[in-house]
Each structure stands twice: as C-alpha cells, then as structure tokens.
C-alpha cells in the first residue's frame, strides 16, 4: 500500500499489460533501480489497467531496491498483468488519469504490446501533459512497428525455447515415423513461427503473410498435403514437422470456422479473436488425416500447440541485457524534461546501439488510430532463404514431367489413382515465386 500522505510527490508508476513475455521483471527492475538512483519513488501497479480504470488505487505497492535486485533472472511478472482495456469508454480513461493523480504519479512506464501501447498513448493524451508516459515494447509475437529488424523483448527467448521444443519434436518425428503439426503463438504476424521454423530446419513453415487476403482452411490443408506427398515421393520419408502460425486464423472467415464442429468463437477485451481457444493444430490434423485415409494411404499426425509455455520462461542473456537498457531508457526520457501536451508520450527503442524515442503518433495506423502491426516481409532475402530450405510444392515440380509423375504416383493408391494431370489440377495453384533470395 502506498502512503497517501506522500501521494503529492512526482512518483514513477510502472504497470504491465497484455500477455506475459520473458524479460518483464528485468524491465521493472531496471526502471525501479534507476528511478531510485534519481531519488524518485516507484509505485508498482498490479494487474495492468484493471483496477485504475475502476478508480481503485489499493492494488499498488512501493518498489525498493530489495524488491527488484534479482528478479531479472525470472520469468513472469511480479506485478502480474491483464488485458483490461481502458480505451473503450472515456469514463474509464478518466478514472485511470484520476487514479494516477491520486497516487502522485507524474511519470508512467507501461510494459506491453500493441494494445497496451495504444492504451498508454490515450492515457498520455487524456492527461493533457500532466502525466508523462513511456512505453516499453514487449511481445513474443515481435509485431510492434520498431524500425528495421529490431526485435521486441521476449521474442528471442521465446524463439530459443520454441526451437528447442521443435528440435525435440523433429527427432521424435523421425524416430516414430510421424508428422507433427505445430501451431505457434502469433496473433497477427508470423515472426515467431518463421523464426522457429527457420532456426530448426523444420520441414515447412506457414505464416499468414503468405496470403494477401482471406485464406481457406482447405488451402492450408492442400499445402500440408502437398508437402507430405513430396517428402514421401522424392525422399521416401514418412515423417516431418510443419510449423504453423496461429495468426492464420485471423484470415479465415468466421463463417468457415463456425462450420467446424467443436469450434466456438470468442474475443478478448480488445476485440481480438481468442486464437488459443480454436485448436488449429487439431483441425488441420483431422482434415489432412481424413484426406489420406480416404485414399487408403497411411499417415500419422500429432498436433501440438506452442505458446503459453514460452511466455513466462526465464529470459536468455540477450533479453536480460536488452531489457536493462530499455528500462534505463524509459527513466532517462521520463525524467529528462517537463512534459507538455504535445510531448507527453513515446516508445523507447534501441536503434543501432543507441536509445531512441518514437512518438506514439508515428507508430499508429493513420486510418484506425490503433498501433500499426509489423508483419513478416515476404519479399526479403531472409524470408526467401527460409523458403529455399522448406519442402513444399514449387513451380519446378510441375515443370519436370518425371518428377510430376512420381508425385502423382505418391498420391495414388489401389483405391484411388491420381494421374499427373489430376495432380497438377489439384495442387499447382499453390506455387509461388517466393523461393530463393534474389
């Protein structure tokens, strides 16, 4: 509990919004230690905006050196987190600003992803310069619009742990002669799925950026089926691992999802589809296995989801170092000059080894006002090289008549024959020019 008698001071507040990510505690630690070094009191706010937007200032505590000195090694968040959204109602935003004022908080550090950043920008706007807000970008999705290839903190730890899990699944796949369909967390972008797939050399990776618009589940199944047939036909291997970004679901028609037995569509406080509640891995496993069973072709698929086990992992050294710099940078900006209505909020980033501060407005979509999403750029050498090492049906497979004959033969069974022309008609539409760096 914060001493109300001291609430008039210019305190530093810190809160966490959105899902967990490795490194959160390191940010809290760096912010607290640097603020205390500058003789500022630090108020830790529990559960994001959840209580502040109700006008409840009791879920806070003062943070001292001993509270944070070793927490940077640990996953999770000592302040917890929540997806409470104060931007839906102006009354909620007003209560947030009033609550911060009651706590004597003139400087607020928010830790979170795109939604929390948008909420932070609105708090800064509604405070009219009375509260300065600095946002520290956090998400294992890596989808905040930071310049260039700069990752959000937590991403590299999530990729490392995810890669270790997929590496184990690849060995299990080889040992047991099975396929694994691994769906990886990533609401709007395929950075994590592609990062894991490329690092491990998974058989193939599927990300939403491959599809310019809506995508059908049947198309995803066609890609997977084609990859399985090609691997069997050309290398005589009945095993493999497909890494699939859960964000594909965002581009599937809700009507198509609703038609799938057992699927229930719900949304979170920010209006996003609750992707983890739609088991894409199981849906794909069931549909692809059915395709092979209908032709009496043997296929064993295991479905696996990777996401929650990555979010609260202990951060690797990269993220431990990274978040210390970000936390310091947040305090450096917050306490550097007096806030004004025009200069009251920013995002802290490390660009070319230097601390930079990006205005909230520069990170927002001009049409919606919401935070822009950074997606995988599929026309880059990085993505095209990743495609080079995947096993998928490509244009050259249909240009080579002998290879096409072998592929068609792999898709055939005594129960259902497949001619080269039928194979071409069935799968050629999947081919692209995305393979190989240019």
Predicted region positions:
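Gly-rich Lys/Arg/Thr-decorated short loops/hinges at beta-loop-alpha junctions or inter-strand turns
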Residues: 11-14, 71-83, 138-150, 175-177, ...
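Short, ordered loop/turn segments at secondary-structure junctions
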Residues: 17-19, 40, 45-50, 83-84, ...
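Accessory alpha-helical/coil subdomains and C-terminal extensions
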Residues: 99, 107-112, 118-122, 126-134, ...
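C-terminal non-catalytic interaction/assembly regions of soluble proteins
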Residues: 257-438
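Short glycine/serine/threonine-rich phosphate/pyrophosphate-binding segments
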Residues: 21-31, 52-53, 90-92, 111-121, ...
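Glycine-rich oxoanion-binding loops at beta->alpha junctions
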Residues: 1-5, 52-108, 116, 140, ...
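N-terminal phosphate-binding or glycine-rich loops at protein starts, especially the Walker A/P-loop
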Residues: 2-56
């Amino acid at each position: 509990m914060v001493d109300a008698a001291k609430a008039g001071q210019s305190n530093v507040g810190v809160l966490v919004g959105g899902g967990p990510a490795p490194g959160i505690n390191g940010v809290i630690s760096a912010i607290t230690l640097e603020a205390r070094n500058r003789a500022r009191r630090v108020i830790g706010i529990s559960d994001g905006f959840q209580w502040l937007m109700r006008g409840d200032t009791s879920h806070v505590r003062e943070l001292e050196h001993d509270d944070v000195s070793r927490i940077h090694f640990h996953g999770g968040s000592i302040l917890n987190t929540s997806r409470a959204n104060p931007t839906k109602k102006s009354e909620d935003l007003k209560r947030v600003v009033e609550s911060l004022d009651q706590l004597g908080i003139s400087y607020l550090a928010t830790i979170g992803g795109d939604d929390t950043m948008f909420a932070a920008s609105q708090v800064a706007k509604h405070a009219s310069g009375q509260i300065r807000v600095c946002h520290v970008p956090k998400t294992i999705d890596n989808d905040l619009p930071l310049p260039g290839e700069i990752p959000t903190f937590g991403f590299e730890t999530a990729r490392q742990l995810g890669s270790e899990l997929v590496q184990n699944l690849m060995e299990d796949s080889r040992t047991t002669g099975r396929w694994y369909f691994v769906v990886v967390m990533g609401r709007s972008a395929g950075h994590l799925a592609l990062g894991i797939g490329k690092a491990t050399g998974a058989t193939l990776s599927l990300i939403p950026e491959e599809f310019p618009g809506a995508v059908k589940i049947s198309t995803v199944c066609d890609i997977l089926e084609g990859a399985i047939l090609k691997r069997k036909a050309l290398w005589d291997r009945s095993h493999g691992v497909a890494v699939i970004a859960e964000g594909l679901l965002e581009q599937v028609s809700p009507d198509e999802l609703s038609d799938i037995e057992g699927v229930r569509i719900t949304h979170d406080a920010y209006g996003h589809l609750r992707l983890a509640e739609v088991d894409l891995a199981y849906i794909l496993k069931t549909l692809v296995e059915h395709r092979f069973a209908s032709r009496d072709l043997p296929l064993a698929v295991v479905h696996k989801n990777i996401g929650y086990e990555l979010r609260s992992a202990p951060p690797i050294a990269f993220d431990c170092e990274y978040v210390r710099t970000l936390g310091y940078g947040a305090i450096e900006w917050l306490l550097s000059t007096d806030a004004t209505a025009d200069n009251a909020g920013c995002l802290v980033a490390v660009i070319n080894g230097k601390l930079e501060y990006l205005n909230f407005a520069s990170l927002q979509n001009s049409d919606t006002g919401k935070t822009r999403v950074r997606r995988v750029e599929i026309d880059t050498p990085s993505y095209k090289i990743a495609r080079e090492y995947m096993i998928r049906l490509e244009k050259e497979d249909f240009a080579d008549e002998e290879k096409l004959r072998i592929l068609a033969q792999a898709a055939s069974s005594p129960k259902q024959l497949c001619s080269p022309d039928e194979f071409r008609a069935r799968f050629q539409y999947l081919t692209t020019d995305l393979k190989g760096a240019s």
